[in-house]
Each structure stands twice: as C-alpha cells, then as structure tokens.
C-alpha cells in the first residue's frame, strides 16, 4: 500500500478536548493499524532482516536469514511461518487471536498430485503444499491451544485413498521422494496425536466426505448452474475455522491457483467425478471457485514455501517466500503481485470482490515484513491463459 499519513490519536483527543475543530483533511483518515477494515498481510522472505511499519512500529527480522534461493532447513522455513503468522493477523494479534481453544479447525491443504503412484507421478517441487509448513502450522496451533480438533483435508482430482484404490501409496502416505525429510501427512498426524493427546488430529479426503446439497450463499456465479446448488462436504460446512494453505502456483485456466482457488478441492469427486469434470460443466473455473469459496470463506490463508510452479505447471521456481493473513483475497492479491501478475486481471479476484470477500487493490492492503517489490520474482505465465480486462478498484 502507499504510505499514508497516520494521525496521532493522542493529539486528536487533546485537540477535541480543547474545543478545537478538527481540520477536514484530518477527518478523512484512510487506513491505520488500528482499523481492522484494512487487511494486514505478512510477507516474509527467507532473507528478512526486519522492517518498519507505516506507523513507525518495528518488525524484528528472522534470527537466521538466508538467501531466497537457498535450500532451507526445517527450522528455517518454520521460523518464516511463525513470523508470517505473527505479523499477518489482525490488529488484536496474530492467528492465535482468531482461533479459540475449543474450535474445530480444518486445514485445507493442496495435494493435487501424488508422488509414487506410477512412473509419471513424480514430485514437482512447488506443485503441492510444503509439508514442513503444515507441520509448523499445526505445532503453532497446538502450542497456543488453538483448536480442540484439527483436520487436514483435501479432495484431489488425481489420487484416491489407498483403501479405495489398488495403489500402495496415496497423498496421505507419500513421502514425496524425501523432499520434506521423509515427512508424510500420516506420520505427521501420528506424531502430533502422541504429543498432544487432548487434541483430535485427523486426515480427511473431501472427495468421500458426507455431503449436503446447498444453494450458494448470496448469488451463484456459475452460469450453467441455474439452481445455484452444489454438493458441499459436511466438514467444510460444519467446522468452526478454515485455514487455506497453498503453494505459489500458476494455472492454465485461472492464471494463478492460490488460497481462494484452493477451494476447487472441496468439490467432492464422489459427486463430480474424477478429475472433477462435473464441476467444470457448471460454469467457468473462476466462477466455480468463488461459488465454492462462498460456503465457508477462509478464516486465514497462507501461501508459499520454498518452491512454486510457473508456466503450464511443470517448471519449478525456487523462491523462499511465505505470505499470510486473515483475508484470503488480500493474501492472494499480494501473492499474485509477488509472482509478477497484475491482480486486477485475475477474474476470480474480481468476482470475489464483487461478492464482498475483500479487495484486490494493493494500495488498500497493509503489507508487513518485506515490501511486495522486494518479494517479487516474476513467474512465467501459462501459455493459454487470457488475462481478464483490468477493472478499477
């Protein structure tokens, strides 16, 4: 956001007490750290050494900053996440102020593909959520007593759970060729269950969760879905808090696939088929994305890791960056800008704003930590993607 003049509340109060009329230009306060309507987004490169907010508040840097293209240890990337959670929350505090001790928390991760299913199913760095970030997020939640039940959920278009297929591996049990130090989701849940017996940890395939048929809250956008009704997993409908956790990734149909587009994974394959072609019959992907997002807009969103994916999906980008905040559209706006995209040309951003889920104007987003320009690393755009006509915010 552009630097704005921040009024000293004490001075204003003193002037009011003295009976002085406040100048009109001072009445037109735009955005301050004390106004929650301005979304805050934490931006943390692995090289982050500290910064200063627009109101003069200091933000301490990472204890062990590293180059943005260096392979990171688990401890280093987890420190990045903790910093992003700290500075990307609300005025009242970070993620720990959003989630209550007795909440049912769903972490919607992104595991579209699965390493080890066959000779063609290899892990492409950046194509799935970094498991070390998931691990660090759960450790944060458990350590701050945020959540009584924590569910890691995904509904992949490509793989099914082992118990429903003949495959020896699935997205929950894959160790991704050692990319995350031998970590798998199954191991992760087992370890946390042993350490925190008072919390229920679980894995859930949204493709086979119980569903309800529900109209889209507000107006449905998908033009081939005149009734505006979707099958919605009960887990998504009934959980108290939902965190969308996705890599920085391009997509041939939507330009980028970040925390809002992560909601394509909630459309159950048991109802829409594999690879969920039934969803795409209901309308354009951007429309379906925002329809699905409407059922339970993310309470918090986290993007990035060590790797992302550019172009049409096969080319990895090494860029150590984590972006986090309580408004998913604001987080995606910063993420898209960091990838070299114009947020005004992403159609599902436009649609999400139209439905009241926030805005995509960088000038109206309080970025904390690294500046967006400093975090920018242009990603190659998908060959067939057509930017939407840019609209004014």
Regions found by a protein language model. Name each.
Residues 3-393:
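N-terminal and secondary-structure boundary signal
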């Amino acid at each position: 956001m552009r630097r704005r003049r921040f009024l000293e509340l004490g001075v204003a109060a003193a002037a009011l007490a003295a009976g002085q009329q406040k100048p009109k230009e001072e009445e037109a306060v735009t955005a301050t750290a004390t106004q929650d309507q301005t979304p805050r987004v934490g931006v943390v490169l692995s090289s982050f050494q500290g910064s200063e907010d627009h109101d003069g508040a200091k933000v301490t840097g990472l204890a062990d900053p590293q180059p943005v293209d260096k392979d990171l240890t688990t401890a280093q990337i987890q420190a990045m996440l903790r910093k992003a959670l700290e500075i990307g929350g609300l005025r009242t505090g970070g993620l720990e102020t959003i989630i209550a001790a007795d909440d049912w928390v769903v972490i919607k991760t992104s595991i579209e593909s699965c390493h080890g299913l066959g000779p063609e199913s290899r892990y492409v760095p950046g194509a799935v959520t970094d498991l070390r970030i998931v691990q660090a997020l759960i450790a944060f939640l458990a350590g701050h007593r945020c959540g009584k039940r924590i569910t890691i959920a995904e509904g992949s278009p490509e793989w099914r759970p082992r118990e429903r297929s003949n495959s020896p591996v699935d997205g929950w049990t894959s160790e991704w060729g050692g990319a995350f130090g031998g970590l798998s989701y199954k191991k992760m849940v087992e370890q946390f269950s042993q350490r925190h017996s008072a919390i229920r940890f679980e894995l859930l395939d949204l493709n086979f969760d119980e569903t309800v048929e529900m109209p889209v809250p507000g107006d449905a956008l998908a033009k081939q879905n005149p009734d505006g009704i979707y099958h919605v997993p009960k887990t998504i409908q009934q959980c108290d808090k939902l965190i969308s956790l996705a890599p920085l990734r391009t997509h041939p149909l939507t330009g980028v696939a970040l925390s809002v587009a992560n909601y394509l994974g909630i459309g159950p394959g048991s109802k829409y088929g594999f690879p969920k072609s039934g969803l795409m019959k209901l309308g354009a992907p951007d429309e379906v994305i925002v329809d699905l997002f409407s059922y339970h807009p993310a309470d918090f969103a986290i993007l990035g890791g060590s790797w992302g994916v550019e172009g049409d999906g096969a080319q990895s980008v090494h860029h150590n960056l984590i972006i986090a905040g309580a408004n998913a559209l604001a987080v995606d706006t910063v993420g898209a800008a960091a990838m070299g995209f114009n947020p005004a040309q992403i159609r599902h951003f436009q649609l999400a704003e139209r439905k009241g889920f926030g805005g995509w104007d960088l000038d109206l987003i309080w970025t904390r930590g690294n500046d967006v320009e400093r975090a920018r690393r242009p990603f190659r755009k998908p060959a067939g993607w057509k930017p939407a006509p840019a609209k004014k915010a």
